[in-house]
């Protein structure tokens, strides 16, 4: 079938387009099932984009197009990839809820859900409403989608819950070899799952909920502690709220605010609604974030060496660097025993355009800025 790959790749958006065609032609789900011979559960999966087998998808989409009297051109025309309806339905929010929060009209939101191109201002408002990032709304994210919400408060909790989005689960504490204390970070439910899945690997990448991504060399890690948010704080393991020297409780901050911090810091004009600008200012005020801290949040890198030495720097992902390549390879690689493609040294451009070269075997852990890192990986891999 012509354009079958495009239809399958955009199956969430195509599902929304089919719903719109059904509304326009006044065809119910029951009627579509009767005329195509498709079961109701299968149709629901087609409309939500949850069919994962391409052969089955191609078979069912052909039946649906024949029944509706439309071509693939109709479904693909003027479509812009976004997950607005998908996430809204997972969160069980009505389109009126989104309209009330964002100030975007219901009709305009419907157009966006059906594949119309949204402005950056609209995308940012929608991302704020869903407590996530613009990358997630556009379906461009490299790391697993995060919602700045308690995972237990996200609907469909259970063994079969949807892993498309996930929220705050608890904390991960990491003690590097020769490290003087544990470092703690907020993580999602899926990240916890990945830690167990990958713990035998030589390297692990851990996306966190405070705009940090961790790169761990497991040969140089002594201990990892996973702490459910309902557990008592581990006062014997350097818990930051007891020492008062760090802030980790930022799991409730939507990533879209981190995306906008740089513009706030530089005082640049940017596509942003008044409501979102107010949310950004409240975030900076509530956490008492200084200009130096903003620079660290958006561009900072922490290097924890195997010998216990710690260094702080900034990193420019659009200059000469290969750290984003190492992260994307480890995070997205299926053959975990094959690291021959990885460089033995890491290099990057840092503060005052200093070019640094580090032997990978001497690194225990890197702390990297989530948003800048993900955007660099997206651009390099044309995601």
Regions found by a protein language model. Give the residues of each.
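A short, Lys/Arg-rich alpha-helix, primarily the initiator
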Residues: 1-28, 71-91
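Intrinsic disorder/low-complexity detector
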Residues: 2-9, 74-80, 86, 134-181, ...
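Helix-turn-helix DNA-binding elements, focusing on the entry/boundary residues of the two helices
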Residues: 29, 61, 84, 95, ...
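Key DNA-contact positions within bacterial/archaeal DNA-binding proteins
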Residues: 30, 41, 73, 96, ...
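Short alpha-helical "recognition helix" segments of helix-turn-helix
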Residues: 31-34, 94-100
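Recognition helix of helix-turn-helix/homeodomain-like DNA-binding domains
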Residues: 37-55, 103-118
């Amino acid at each position: 079938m012509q354009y079958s790959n495009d239809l399958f790749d955009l199956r969430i958006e195509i599902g929304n387009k089919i719903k719109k065609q059904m509304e326009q032609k006044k065809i119910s789900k029951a009627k579509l099932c009767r005329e195509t011979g498709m079961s109701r559960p299968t149709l629901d999966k087609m409309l939500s984009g949850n069919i994962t087998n391409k052969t089955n998808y191609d078979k069912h989409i052909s039946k649906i197009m024949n029944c509706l009297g439309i071509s693939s051109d109709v479904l693909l025309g003027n479509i812009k990839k976004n997950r607005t309806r998908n996430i809204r339905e997972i969160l069980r929010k009505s389109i009126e809820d989104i309209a009330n929060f964002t100030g975007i009209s219901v009709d305009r939101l419907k157009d966006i859900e059906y594949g119309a191109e949204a402005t950056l201002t609209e995308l940012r408002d929608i991302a704020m409403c869903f407590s996530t990032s613009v990358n997630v709304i556009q379906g461009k994210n490299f790391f697993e989608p995060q919602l700045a919400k308690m995972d237990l408060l996200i609907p469909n909790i259970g063994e079969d819950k949807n892993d498309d989005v996930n929220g705050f689960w608890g904390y991960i504490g990491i003690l590097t070899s020769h490290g003087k204390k544990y470092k703690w970070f907020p993580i999602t439910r899926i990240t916890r799952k990945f830690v167990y899945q990958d713990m035998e690997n030589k390297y692990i990448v851990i996306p966190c909920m405070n705009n940090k991504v961790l790169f761990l060399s497991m040969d140089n890690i002594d201990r990892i502690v996973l702490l459910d948010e309902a557990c008592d704080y581990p006062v014997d393991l350097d818990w930051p709220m007891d020492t008062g020297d760090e802030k980790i409780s930022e799991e409730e901050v939507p990533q879209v605010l981190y995306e906008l911090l740089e513009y706030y810091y530089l005082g640049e004009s940017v596509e942003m609604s008044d409501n979102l600008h107010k949310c950004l200012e409240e975030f900076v005020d509530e956490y008492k974030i200084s200009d130096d801290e903003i620079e660290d949040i958006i561009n900072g890198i922490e290097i924890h060496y195997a010998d216990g030495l710690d260094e702080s720097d900034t990193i420019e992902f659009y200059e000469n660097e290969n750290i984003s390549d190492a992260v994307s390879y480890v995070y997205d690689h299926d053959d975990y025993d094959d690291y021959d493609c990885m460089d033995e040294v890491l290099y990057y451009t840092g503060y005052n355009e200093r070019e640094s070269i580090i032997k990978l075997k001497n690194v225990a852990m890197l702390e990297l800025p989530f948003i800048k890192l993900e955007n660099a990986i997206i651009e390099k891999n044309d995601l």
